[in-house]
Amino acid sequence: MDGELVAFDTDGRPDLPRLLRRHGLTDPWRIRQARHWCPVRYVLFDLLYHAGRCLVREPLARRREVLAEVCQRLDAAVRFSAGVIDVGTAFYQAAVACGHEGVMAKHLTSAYRPGKRSAAWKKIKPGLRKGLASTGANCG
């Protein structure tokens, strides 16, 4: 699975500084207490292996279809990042408005390239979105 840890503030907005404070803890007691003041969720956006089968060469659309099915059986601390198709601009604006640093736009036919950036994936942040057309997007 590919995803990222996200901490949320009291209003449910993503809070990177809070996550970084939690990440820096080393004392076991403080780490246990952090689950109360800094709950985190693992937000999943890709599935690389399933049922003993490598999926990295499968198109993103298929990997996410399988991931959505898998996520239905997972703990509440794990969330599926439900991307959007064809409404990238509105999705981007909503993501930035709710505190995300931007979005990832990914071509639905793209394979997963472990450890590498792909031209089929674009990170779109405020000030960096000119001239890009979104074919699909996921928060994160």
Describe each PLM feature range.
Residues 1-140:
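Catalytic cores of nucleic-acid ligases and guanylyltransferases
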